[in-house]
């Protein structure tokens, strides 16, 4: 058992994490050469297309050194800030982590965030400089950055190129020498944590577990502490990205997949503890946090009869991604749909794309919002994540909104642009540090609502793509906020309501009605688009009526005849205006997102 090493790879996006995982897999011959593909750990199409890792994957590698066989359990983690929950979950199951930093780009914001998670779990961290084959690689500068920003000693940092294979053997040997073997307790009652679960069409719900104490065998009867249910172990496997390898038992310190033949993944929820039903452990494994949704949006099917299909699709996705939450909601404008909670904007995009792609649905997503705390005059406190749920202003004593702590690393030449952007988003500066003469670390406290829309795009365009950004929720602070409603043809469109700071409401209202005017199709009657706060209209635009030339068939003749026809048309339009309905195209709901 002292020959086992459990480790993760942590890095910022695009620093070569998945390529390094590929290289380790091929070096240890875990996947046959003919089955090897680039990004072999990234199994979803979206992951390969976008070049990002979304779902943490595991693989068991075997390596011989000094005539001893070692088992290396590699857990590949996502780099993007939205998926940091996947990272912390993976790191909780390891004893060590490889910190990959691009030797040309240096330390980035998400590198810092993920390293701190590893330090919290007391992991042995091995710094690795990747892409040293690039002509602009500067390993010494990057080592200094790691020491200055993160405070990890880089004298033994390993220089590799995942692309060409330089330094990979040194890295594997360093993993074996420097990462401690797991503490094992084979004689104690079984205690294993479920740190991932997903759904397989043939085998049902699968649980990826890390065994801390004892052993689990095929045909054992296990007891899941969270659900208090008993199940028989039908099969045990070691993880491999191509096809898992079957085994009879998984011992203390090892990682493996348990097949219990369950139809529902909620029966094997992530973070739960598995033990034997006839020899139970006393306490579950603690210190495991559930993912908390951070951003909420309404998701509606464009064809209203597809509501049940959407429910099934969300149920199936939740099997693979326990961090989404959803509840049914109705909207006057969009019909039946769900209010879905996500970990961040990229997560929202990915989930929406997976729903459309894997389940053949056409969906509309409303503007994302956060959870607000509403303190009422009668002493009650409500939490809302849909602006249309906001009570009347007269009943509200104060509104608190969530803040996030943002870390940004940028080249010094773009500092002015960034500070302007952060100030316009109501950011409060807490730290500014020159890492080197031309790179700056900024830390800001900023309302979460200001960063979930298009902040990332603006940050990238203002710094020509060089700045990196990371955020974590901190706490709630009081804000001067009000609800802005949009009326089309005199009717409130609930899906377009947003909560905004009072001093930005007027400008936001004007921008919104202007954008809507371009999108709402012209009708046979004039359509008014208005922005209102309570009963007060603050901005208005009109979509002009389409004119039908009713006098076309009057040749010459009497002007009174023409006038009569025009009057009749006017009457008809008036009547139409009072009872007419306007169908809004789905772009209208997206236009809200685009407004700065």
From Swiss-Prot:
Membrane topology, as annotated: Peripheral membrane protein
HAMAP family attached to this UniProt entry: LepA
Family the entry assigns: Belongs to the TRAFAC class translation factor GTPase superfamily. Classic translation factor GTPase family. LepA subfamily.
A biological-process GO annotation: positive regulation of translation
Gene Ontology terms: cellular component: plasma membrane
Ranges of residues in domain tr-type G: 2-183
GO function term, MF aspect, one: GTP binding
PROSITE patterns: G_TR_1 (PS00301), G_TR_2 (PS51722)
Organism annotation: Campylobacter hominis (strain ATCC BAA-381 / DSM 21671 / CCUG 45161 / LMG 19568 / NCTC 13146 / CH001A)
Protein name as it appears in the record: Elongation factor 4
Cysteine-cysteine disulfides: none
Binding positions (GTP): 14-19, 130-133
Pfam families in the cross-refs: EFG_C, GTP_EFTU, GTP_EFTU_D2, LepA_C
Catalytic activity: GTP + H2O = GDP + phosphate + H(+)
